[in-house]
Amino acid sequence: MHEAQSAAAVGIAMKMEQHREAWRVALAGALCLAVAMGIGRFAFTPLLPMMLHDGVIDLTAGGWLATANYLGYFIGALLCMVLRGSATRFIRIGLAATVLLTLGMGLWQSPGLWLVLRTLAGIASACTFVFASGWCLQRLAQLQAPALGGIIYCGPGLGILLTGLATSAMVSHHWKASYGWLSYALLALLLTAIVWRTFAGPAVSLTPAAAASPQALPPAQIVRQTRGLTTAYALAGFGYIITATFLPVIARQALPGSSWPDLFWPLFGISVSLGAWLATHLPGHWDNRLLLAACYLLQATGILIGVASPSVFGFALGSILLGLPFTAITLFAMRDARRLRGDQARSLMGLLTATYGIGQIVGPPLATRLVQGSGNFTSSLCVAAFTLAAGAGLLGLMYRESRQAQA
């Protein structure tokens, strides 16, 4: 009797320790993505109006800086498909690089050098994102806590929220954009120090019970589903990026003299984190493709609301609808990659991230070209909304094909 009670107590203690470790991994993943994505990629968005105000760049140059970052993101995603070695080592390198490259944006006032720094920052962001996503999701699977995967993707929203609120305060105190970059480098350093020890070694080998196996599908169907998923994910990259790059600029153009434009980007960040958290509470048996299609339609609706009603209410509601599905889209896409490839999904995750990057590369220069022709962002935003709707339609067709194959 005593031995049975002791064994039960040990089992409870092990479960509690496993639960704590799972939360530590999930939160570390969130902070890691806050650095890589929220700061490394998206701190540029709220700082862009400050850079325009300082006269260090114009809108066209800002579009090219954004494109350079997305080109780097694409290159980094391709690298992830061929890089071999410890995921945690690449995560640490990516975090350290993000800190240094963000610091460089504040130290050197050279648009030509900024193009190089933003390109390298994109590479670091992609590598950190892919390796951190893969490592954390695998570790959570080992700890039998895959439902916490959505917590990881709260990180970008957290970073966007912090940088958005901080930038709003900087604007009110008439800071230069360079001070903003230096401040965000310090913030990235602090967050990196917090998670550094978590990414100290490789994930332990999966037990057979914990390993993820690809769904039993005919090879031809797996190929078609993979192609469809990568195409749809590329459309998502193009569809969101125009608004995500230029939201503060668009809002300032529509609401001149108002203080509200500084708050739409933090609202977007809150919505990103909330959406990622809500995604963890959806039933696990819901189909990822249908969830992705719903997310695409939400984002398209948010964009069109901003076009139809360029007011405080319209931009606020649009920011919420654009942000809620933002990283949920990534979570559902990465989960579908694991459905198709199981624990060998890292290369597919890299491919998805690369195609997403292609969409992002095309978006900003197209937007600035359309703005030069029309004087506003309406046409580029309508193109973005149409692209998201097309992606939702493709995902719906993929789901119908798989259902018909199972019938």
Regions inferred by a protein language model and the residue ranges of each:
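C-terminal transmembrane helical hairpin of 12-TM major facilitator-type secondary transporters
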Residues: 287-333
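Extracytoplasmic gate region of multi-pass secondary transporters
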Residues: 45, 225-266, 270
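Conserved MFS/SLC helix-loop-helix module at the cytosolic interface between two early adjacent transmembrane helices
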Residues: 75-110
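Helix-loop-helix hairpin linking two adjacent transmembrane segments in secondary transporters
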Residues: 144-200
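Helix-to-loop junctions at the C-terminal end of transmembrane segments
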Residues: 76-88, 275-288, 371
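Cytoplasmic helix-loop-helix junction between adjacent transmembrane helices
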Residues: 119-155
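Paired small-residue
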Residues: 112-121, 313-321
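A late C-terminal transmembrane helix in Major Facilitator Superfamily
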Residues: 343-376, 384
